[in-house]
Amino acid sequence: MIRTPVCDLLQIKYPIALGGLGGGFTQPAMVAAVSDVGGFGALGCAGMSASQVTAASAAIRKITDKPFALNFLLFMIDEDAFAAALAEKPVGIALAWPRGDQDIK
């Protein structure tokens, strides 16, 4: 079994993380499934409201007690949704900002 410092930091068994894809591509059940098998599940929160972030976090916690992350795209972040994520206190909050020069053309 591969064990890295990231495993200890995130409280996971394997150094495998689910990408927090927004737009509804990651759902609470998928996040919980990855976390349950020892990886680090992440929920894409881009475009979500504060109440949606809170509800999704509750749905994940209803399925699993394992650690997970909430993921935000900074260029379209909703401050209330981000505040709701902070209040949920997930093990991780992931932030991203895309660069146009890295797009596949």
Where are these regions (language model features)?
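Active-site entrance/lid segments in N-terminal catalytic domains of soluble metabolic enzymes
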Residues: 1-105
